[in-house]
Amino acid sequence: MSNMDIDGINTGTIDKTPEEITSGTSGTTRPIIRPATLAPPSNKRTRNPSPERATTSSEADVGRKTQKKQTPTEIKKSVYNMVVKLGEFYNQMMVKAGLNDDMERNLIQNAHAVERILLAATDDKKTEFQRKKNARDVKEGKEEIDHNKTGGTFYKMVRDDKTIYFSPIRITFLKEEVKTMYKTTMGSDGFSGLNHIMIGHSQMNDVCFQRSKALKRVGLDPSLISTFAGSTLPRRSGATGVAIKGGGTLVAEAIRFIGRAMADRGLLRDIKAKTAYEKILLNLKNKCSAPQQKALVDQVIGSRNPGIADIEDLTLLARSMVVVRPSVASKVVLPISIYAKIPQLGFNVEEYSMVGYEAMALYNMATPVSILRMGDDAKDKSQLFFMSCFGAAYEDLRVLSALTGIEFKPRSALKCKGFHVPAKEQVEGMGAALMSIKLQFWAPMTRSGGNEVGGDGGSGQISCSPVFAVERPIALSKQAVRRMLSMNIEGRDADVKGNLLKMMNDSMAKKTNGNAFIGKKMFQISDKNKTNPVEIPIKQTIPNFFFGRDTAEDYDDLDY
């Protein structure tokens, strides 16, 4: 203990009892100084489910452990309650914005505006950072910005004879008002609702944009795109966000951390930074589905001074995840404008599953409308919307085509841009279209990588990350994977690397034929109880990979 003086008490030598110390003559309560060994142990592995980024208290931890585990029915009821409340919040925000027409409320861009405003209003840490930064800027003579407000671009409907157009309007809200309205509607802090929205935005980004720059920056090949799910998820999405992230996303986070540690050798001496780094690696280890992959992560965890060798190990791990896929959770996330329609759609079951029939039935009932940007094709835009809702950016296009009865195209063949309209494109009288692609069949969603089997693939994107649990061959470009396998495995952990490469080679050799998700079938959308399973037809004329040869704009080039 250091010899610093606390309230007149020298902490170097204490010759009084704690009671004598605390009974001061001034009547004020003084601290009890306890030996360091009596301090409660810190729980390094405490997860933070809160999007406010606050640390979880040990009392809350104990409370969670003693809670009775929810039954599947109870979970479905609480999820139903959450999505209905999100819809109520959307309706309140639209009333406040003065947008009351059904067409305005069905507009995906208006839903996204409300969602972004809510996320900005509830991000206290970012608001505090902006305030401090702005205070410094004002001292340097820059303009003062009111960070107590947040806003977004909404679209108001304009009727011209028989034609309907939309015109952009900028509306601002007080952050505190938005927060209060949200918490009152949800009946709690509503962290699960915020996480749900963040996942929806992440899935939309995965579909609309490529992440070549982000992959190249950490030395990963752009062909590993199928492992990069959830790469735009904010850290405050907590454990829910980690479940959605692909293995490559976590590898990239770890490599970035190692890069910072190499530039600043004191970084990992900071307990907060070290804990954050260890947490990323533990999450990565939990993602891995093969013991050889877990052994490689253990090798990196055991490294005292992370450096180039660890980056090489993690790069190999990311490559192996193309062949032996990690567990990535899949969820159906719809714009909150659709949840607002639940009472009107006759959706009378008070249970809702984000991975099962209810979410898919709700998607089919909805009538979402999107602004069309210059050169957008309405059918192609519908495909983007479908894939965004189902998080199907890296799913096999043949599976999606079988479920919808529509031939899905790769990203490079789609004549449409993302759903966010940049400021320079916002003009008076913008057209819109109904998102028309619907499910003819449904199948439960999966969190498994479908590792039973592999198959042949193409170029560009070289593997799939399954979303729907239906029996099919897993598309994989063996030629591209074999190119990646020709690497140097010498060094401190040659055995671990060698084992992993052997596993990949064995996997490639034996998995030429056969299917993954054996016995899993699809069902007609009217068949809620799975009474008549249907074999999935795989059309060989449709390409496997959405990002085969991609021409999408990069997420990093976005002009928000």
Swiss-Prot record:
Per the record, the GO terms for biological process are: symbiont entry into host cell; viral penetration into host nucleus
Describe the function of this protein. Answer: Encapsidates the negative strand viral RNA, protecting it from nucleases. The encapsidated genomic RNA is termed the ribonucleoprotein (RNP) and serves as template for transcription and replication. The RNP needs to be localized in the host nucleus to start an infectious cycle, but is too large to diffuse through the nuclear pore complex. NP comprises at least 2 nuclear localization signals that are responsible for the active RNP import into the nucleus through cellular importin alpha/beta pathway.
What is the scientific name of the source organism? Answer: Influenza B virus (strain B/Panama/45/1990)
What name does the UniProt record give this protein? Nucleoprotein
Keyword RNA-binding assigned = yes
Polar residues bias spans? 10-29
Which of UniProt's keywords are assigned here? Answer: Capsid protein, Helical capsid protein, Host nucleus, Host-virus interaction, Ribonucleoprotein, RNA-binding, Viral nucleoprotein, Viral penetration into host nucleus, Virion, Virus entry into host cell
HAMAP family named in the record:
INFV_NCAP
Region span, Disordered: 1-73
Q: Self-association or partners: how does it assemble?
A: Homomultimerizes to form the nucleocapsid. May bind host exportin-1/XPO1. Binds to viral genomic RNA. Protein-RNA contacts are mediated by a combination of electrostatic interactions between positively charged residues and the phosphate backbone and planar interactions between aromatic side chains and bases.
